[in-house]
Amino acid sequence: ADSLTEEETRANRGTVTEPGVASPFRNRPMEESLRLQDEMRRHLDAGYTMVKMKVGGLPLAEDAQRVEAVKSILPSHAELAVDANCKFGRDEALAYAKMLAPFKLRWFEEPCDPLDFALLAEIASIYDGPLSTGEDLFSTADVENLVRFGGLKPARRDVIQVDPPQAYGIAQYARTLDMLARHQWPRDLLFPHGGNQMSLAIAAGFGLGGAESYPGVFGPFAGFAEEA
């Protein structure tokens, strides 16, 4: 459950036209790691047993330090996922896969273009850990092509993260579930993307693996009710 400050958002959006903007990622790596650790501790203290952080806005070596910093403060029962937001081309994706493998992440999310199933399959062939993707696939046919050609396997505990509100709602999500059942994809490996009440209701109602939450982000859509 990683989030960016306003300054970090501006810095990662691009500094070509804003040469005076200094990214805290680049100039204060230790401060960034400490801030990230503090944020993750807050989520753990709130009861979360899995947290997620972003990578890809910095050089690989600095991202490795950030991942190591977060892993170092997680208790034995907690897990970490890492999200690249579809940023990488082939060379970067493979390099990050090799760097992240020793960390034993719960999953490495969206390492490449969501429709580049050939590259995703190549990453799956060399990455020793679960992958996740699917939030940018908006049709049942796209998700079926993902499981056919993307190299993902239930035996690896790979995760599919379709975003129901963006993928034609609950009725179409139910049809996607039927398709995945035909491919023998277990429901505990489905985590609806979105961090919203629809995704939470779908995860609970269909008996899925879980749903994302964005505590402290997106105003009234942040997090979930205390009884959830």
Placement of each model-derived feature along the sequence:
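Generic enzyme active-site microenvironment
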Residues: K52, A81-V82, W107-F108, S132-G134, ...
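Short, small-residue-enriched loops and turns at beta-alpha junctions
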Residues: G56-E62, A84-E92, E109-F117, L137-T140, ...
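N-terminal capping/lid subdomain adjacent to the active-site entrance of alpha/beta enzymes
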Residues: A1-L80, N85-L94, K98-P102, F224-A228
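Shared catalytic-loop signature of beta/alpha-barrel
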Residues: K98, K104, L115-A228
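Residues at structural and domain junctions
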Residues: A22, Q37, M53-G56, E109, ...
